[in-house]
Amino acid sequence: LGSKVAVVEFENDVHKSLEYALRLIGKMDDLNTPRRPVVIKVGVFDPKAENHTTVSVVDAIIKSFSKAPRIFLAESDNYRGKALDRLQLWKELFSDRVEPFSLSDDTETRKFKFADEELELSHILFKPNALVSTHILRGYERGSILKNLFGLVPDIRKARFHKRLDTLLADIYEAIGGIDLAVLDGTYFYDGFGAMPHIGEDGAKYRVKMNTLLIGRDAVAVETVGAILAGMKPEKMPVLKEFVKRGLGEGDLKNIEVVGASFESLRKRFASAAKTQRNTRAKGDAPQTWGGQANQVMKSLVIDGFFKLPNKRTVDGVTKAFEARGISTEDKEDNIAGILARRVKKGVLRSAKGPNGWVYWTD
């Protein structure tokens, strides 16, 4: 077996459990060295939500790189806020050695062509720096560890890449020389609507505490094992399929050595957690269908001022905004047009027919 993924459960001492997981997957001497700064790419879409790696897990990762001369907690700007503002979630971990880093503000960059477009990536992402990708364990078709690379794109207009996301992420992975360590934070398990990036403050309502960590040097293998625990089918996840097709990691569980806790026992625990979440959603107000989720996203777009003048939005523009908030829009433009028409009828939006079709706005 070529790839190894450690799966460990923990109680209070996250660092001790993470250290144990690292011992299970093998030596870290090539990463934890005075010669290599470390970049920890955290994934924080919305600072108001809690669907990001916990402070405790990031702290444990930092402590595991005891020899690293510098450690950067890295993120880029998005429409929810500046990177440095969103990184304040982990401010208690900042020190002379550990610092927040905005990938959007770096002036020392390298140019690469991605998905038919030239982008500039921060210099800290390239070797010899060691790159750690950490995100939450969730039932989300686009994944977590590999999807986290989307945050390496420095500008806020990331939505333009959503329909080519799998290609873009694999291109970025190859350009920077890959992920050196993947840490999937299963302190909580997010599923259904709770797994969506745009969930906001309601995210904490739709999660189950699991206190589980998945760690490995093969990021594709870690994503695969996490997806299976989350009840997903890796072979049907576009991002994973693209990485496997390029030979960037192992996506077949039969070829992955899962060490640590009993994987079959954990699968049963996570299946039970998913059932608990379904019951919670059934009793609560979380939308469970595409239409329900789409209406929730439309409501958030209106509240966030997406339609506020001078902006006048087309159906195509709204479709891209849906994609940016994690809603699949394939073959859904007519549905989105219908949602917009209903908002106009209710007086929430105004509309007019322009030279390029209908546009929508609020005063």
What spans do the regions from the language model cover?
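N-terminal and secondary-structure boundary signal
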Residues: 1-282
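Alpha-helix C-terminal capping/helix-coil junction sites
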Residues: 244, 323, 340-345
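Short, cationic-aromatic polyanion-contact patches
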Residues: 269-270, 354-363
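Positively charged, polyanion-binding regions of nucleic-acid-associated proteins
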Residues: 290-312, 341-344
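Conserved hydrophobic residue
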Residues: 307, 328, 349-350
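Short acidic, hydrophobic short linear motifs in intrinsically disordered regions
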Residues: 309-324
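Short amphipathic alpha-helical interaction segments
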Residues: 329-344
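A short, conserved structural fragment
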Residues: 344-354
